[in-house]
Amino acid sequence: MIVGIPKEIKNNENRVGMTPAGVNELVKHGHTVYVQKGAGENSGFPDSSYERVGAKILATIEDVYAISEMIVKVKEPIAPEYPLIRKGQLLFTYFHFASDRRLTEAMMSSGATCLAYETVELKDHSLPLLIPMSEVAGRMATQEGARFLERPQGGKGKLMGGVPGVKPAKVLVIGAGVVGYSAARIAAGMGADVTITDLSLIHISEPTRR
């Protein structure tokens, strides 16, 4: 199969649909992979890192869509990409169709087969492709919270872990899902006094087991 990885063009999106390690696996299994020039740069993957594992670099997003049977992205296509998507093409990305009627109608009209990562579900009803994003969100929440405790940011000048003679910050995490657990784990690692609340007793007990 011919797989294409375009550069993300949505504002402030710096991720790339596939790392060189993922490309390497596809190439080893006989697939051809095209990567748009600069697609991985903002994620720390220069074009050369893709070329080393067998990918071919194309200059434009139009070139990638035109040649590829399957497109692998991170974020949903935006309006300039709609005309590039064709019937029979496979498109893998986070779509979030429910919040964007125009996107939904455009994809239906295109005739492409669209797989929304956020809807992939295991037998236990977990959403494995949302877990990495949720873990990042939880960790960033704690980091940002700690930053806004600093005086220059308008905070009280309190360290998360405290210092000798000064108690650590108290952190309340509402919700013990993947995001909440990740936030709580980072806060605890920084030495904060952490409390987690959740409506589910099962969720509350999970961090303890982990």
Identify the function of each model-found stretch:
Residues 180-181:
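N-terminal Rossmann-fold NAD(P) dinucleotide-binding loop
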